[in-house]
UniProtKB/Swiss-Prot annotation:
Keyword Cytoplasm: no
Protein name: Annexin A2
UniProt cross-link Glycyl lysine isopeptide (Lys-Gly) (interchain with G-Cter in SUMO1), position: K37
Modified residue annotations for N6-acetyllysine: K37, K171
Gene Ontology terms for molecular function: calcium ion binding; calcium-dependent phospholipid binding; cytoskeletal protein binding; phosphatidylserine binding; phospholipase inhibitor activity
């Protein structure tokens, strides 16, 4: 937010009794006077003159959340998720196996089970339990998985997407080539074909 940006830019160091020479204090004072006509100017002046205290209090309040490790931050985002499925998807799908272990898989699985339902719950729990990330990519297995996905439909798709490593699933050069080399008409045809095939 704008308030956050302003308060974070205020310096807590140095002598603030005299403004820097480039500081346009007269111009700023006139702008503030114009902006606050008809409001409680005394309160605004009192607040602005105590900006050092405000900045220090604000930064002290923000500091504990800034000191969290990425895993602690993710865990706090997932606690009491309720309906925030976007955060759940982003964290579960983009973190490595090691990062998910740092979040604490037991608590993570409990949170997922308590806050989701149906096939979405099954998919999220399976992703949270996925096998170790492998740095070795088996290209023959990738080709077989692609065929299996095409032939088997959704159930096999969930199995492959949750049991394979992130490296295994990221053959993005092929996708990028297809997206760049095909016209919009071809892409729409592919979309409709896939829609019909998955019904």
């Amino acid at each position: 937010s704008t308030v956050h940006e302003i308060l974070c830019k205020l310096s807590l160091e140095g002598d603030h009794s005299t403004p820097p020479s480039a500081y346009g204090s007269v111009k700023d004072a006139l702008n503030i006077e114009t902006a606050v006509k008809g409001v409680d100017e005394v309160t605004i002046v009192n607040i602005l003159t105590n900006r050092q205290d405000i900045a220090f209090a604000y930064q002290r309040k923000e500091l504990p959340s800034a000191l969290k490790t990425p895993a602690q931050y993710d865990a706090s985002e997932l606690k009491g998720l309720g309906t925030d499925e976007d955060s759940l998807i982003e964290i579960i799908c983009s973190r490595t196996n090691q990062e998910l272990q740092e979040i604490n898989r037991t608590d993570l699985e409990k949170d997922i089970i308590s806050d989701t339902s149906g096939d979405f719950r099954k998919l999220m729990v399976a992703l949270a339990k996925r096998a170790e990330d492998g740095s070795v990519i088996d290209y023959e297995l990738i080709d077989q998985d692609a065929r299996d996905l095409y032939d088997a439909g959704v159930k096999r798709w969930i199995s492959i997407m949750t049991e394979r490593s992130v490296c295994h699933l990221q053959k993005d050069k092929v996708l990028i080539r297809i997206m760049v080399s095909r016209s919009e008409v071809d892409m729409l045809s592919l979309y409709y074909y896939i829609q019909q095939d998955t019904k």
